[in-house]
Swiss-Prot record:
GO terms for molecular function: ATP binding; ATP hydrolysis activity; ATP-dependent DNA damage sensor activity; damaged DNA binding. Belongs to the eukaryotic RecA-like protein family. Signal peptide: none annotated. The keyword DNA-binding applies. This is DNA repair and recombination protein RadA. ATP binds at G107, E108, F109, G110, S111, G112, K113, T114. Involved in DNA repair and in homologous recombination. Binds and assemble on single-stranded DNA to form a nucleoprotein filament. Hydrolyzes ATP in a ssDNA-dependent manner and promotes DNA strand exchange between homologous DNA molecules. The keyword Metal-binding does not apply. PROSITE patterns: RECA_2, RECA_3. One of its GO terms (biological process) is DNA recombination. InterPro entries: AAA+_ATPase (IPR003593), DNA_recomb/repair_Rad51_C (IPR013632), DNA_recomb/repair_RadA (IPR011938), DNA_recomb/repair_RecA-like (IPR016467), DNA_repair_Rad51/TF_NusA_a-hlx (IPR010995), Hlx-hairpin-Hlx_DNA-bd_motif (IPR003583), P-loop_NTPase (IPR027417), RecA_ATP-bd (IPR020588). It holds the Pfam family Rad51. It comes from Methanosarcina acetivorans (strain ATCC 35395 / DSM 2834 / JCM 12185 / C2A). Keywords: ATP-binding, DNA damage, DNA recombination, DNA-binding, Nucleotide-binding.
Length: 325
C-alpha cells in the first residue's frame, strides 16, 4: 500500500484534506475506492474535481487498473482464513471464514446466527497457529444481542480446548461494540468503524473482523410496503458496498446475520428465504443457511460461494461455544 499523504494528491490542499479526514477518508486508499459524488459532497468540491482526485489516488495507491490472473492469484495469498472452531464447518468453507469478503448467516430465530458471530469474535483474537488472525473485532449491534457473558464462556471453552490460560477480560477489551438505533445510524457506524480501525491499526491491534448483527432489522422496520422498496434497496446497496470496502481496506472478515421470511408460492422444498432481495444476494460473497436440529445441534448449509461447492456441516452450540457434533 502507498504511503502518500492526502495533501500530496493533485487538487487536495490542507483544507480539503482536513474535510476528507473528518468524513473518514484518512488514507489515499480510502479516497481511491470512493465515488465522485460521495467525495464531492464530503469535501464541498465539484464532481469533476472529485473525479480527478480519485484518479490520482488510484494511481498513487495502485488501485483500479487491469492485472493478469496470475497476479490476482498472488494477491489472493494475502487473504486470511478465520477458523469457526469446527472441523466440518471449516472444511466446508475451504479453511474458514475469508477476509476481504462478506459472509452472510441467515436463518430463523434460535438457529445460532448470533452464537456463530460471538464465537468468531473470540476466535479471531487467537494467533494464526490456533486458526485466528491476531486481530480486534468491531460489532454493529442492531438488536441488542451482544452478550459479554457469552464471550467469557467461550474464552473459557477455548482455554479448556487448547490447555491454555486465556483471560476473558483481555478478549472483551479487543471487542468494540456500537448499538445502531436506526438504518441511517447503522450506515454511519460503518464510517465510524473505518476511523476506529485506522486508530487500532496504528496501535498494532488491526481489526480483522466486522460483524453486523442483524443486517436487515432496521431496514425492515422502517421501510414498510412495496412503495418504499426502491428507496430501501438503494440505501441497502450503499450499506453493503460500504461493508465490502471495509473488508478490502483492512483485510478483514465481514460477517452479517440476516432474518428470513417464508415464500408463500413455494409449493415444494423449503420456503424459507433470506430478506434483503437481490442486493444482499449479489453482494454477499458466501451465504450460509442455519437451521435448528435436535437439542444443541445446528445444521449449516453453504448456499452460495464463488469458489466452493454447496455443502452442509453439523455443529453443536454448547455452553463452551461452537463445537463439532
Amino acid at each position: 500500500m502507498s504511503e502518500v499523504a492526502l495533501e500530496e494528491l493533485p487538487g487536495v490542499g490542507p483544507a480539503t484534506a482536513e474535510k476528507l479526514k473528518e468524513a473518514g477518508f484518512n488514507t489515499v486508499e480510502a479516497v481511491a475506492v470512493a465515488s465522485p459524488s460521495e467525495l464531492a459532497t464530503t469535501a464541498e468540491i465539484g464532481e469533476s474535481t472529485a473525479a480527478k482526485i480519485i484518479n490520482s489516488a488510484r494511481q498513487a495507491a495502485d488501485i483500479g487498473g487491469f492485472e493478469t490472473g496470475d497476479l490476482v492469484l498472488e494477491r489472493r495469498k494475502l487473504v486470511g482464513k478465520l477458523t469457526t472452531g469446527c472441523v466440518e464447518f471449516d472444511e466446508m468453507m475451504g479453511g474458514g471464514i475469508e477476509t476481504q469478503s462478506i459472509t452472510e448467516l441467515y436463518g430463523e430465530f434460535g438457529s445460532g446466527k448470533t452464537q456463530v458471530a460471538h464465537q468468531l469474535a473470540v476466535n479471531v483474537q487467537m494467533d494464526k497457529e490456533h486458526g485466528g488472525l491476531d486481530g480486534s473485532v468491531i460489532i454493529i449491534d442492531t438488536e441488542n444481542t451482544f452478550r459479554p457473558e457469552r464471550i467469557t464462556q467461550m474464552v473459557k471453552g477455548l482455554s479448556e480446548k487448547y490447555g491454555m490460560e486465556l483471560d476473558p477480560e483481555e478478549f472483551l477489551q479487543n471487542i468494540h461494540v456500537a448499538r445502531a438505533y436506526n438504518s441511517n445510524h447503522q450506515i454511519l457506524l460503518v464510517d465510524s468503524a473505518t476511523d476506529l480501525a485506522n486508530e487500532l491499526k496504528e496501535m498494532g491491534k488491526p481489526v480483522r473482523l466486522l460483524i453486523v448483527d442483524s443486517l436487515m432489522a432496521h431496514f425492515r422496520a422502517e421501510y414498510v410496503g412495496r412503495g418504499t422498496l426502491a428507496d430501501r434497496q438503494q440505501k441497502l446497496n450503499k450499506h453493503m458496498h460500504g461493508l465490502l470496502r471495509f473488508g478490502d481496506l483492512f483485510n478483514a472478515c465481514v460477517v452479517v446475520t440476516n432474518q428470513v421470511m417464508a415464500k408463500p408460492d413455494a409449493f415444494f422444498g423449503d420456503p424459507t428465504r433470506p430478506v434483503g432481495g437481490h442486493i444482499v444476494g449479489h453482494t454477499a460473497t458466501f451465504r450460509l443457511y442455519l437451521r435448528k436440529s435436535k437439542g444443541e445441534k445446528r445444521i449449516i448449509r453453504l448456499v452460495d460461494s464463488p469458489s466452493l461447492p454447496e455443502g452442509e456441516a453439523v455443529v453443536a452450540v454448547t455452553t463452551a461455544g461452537l463445537t463439532d457434533q
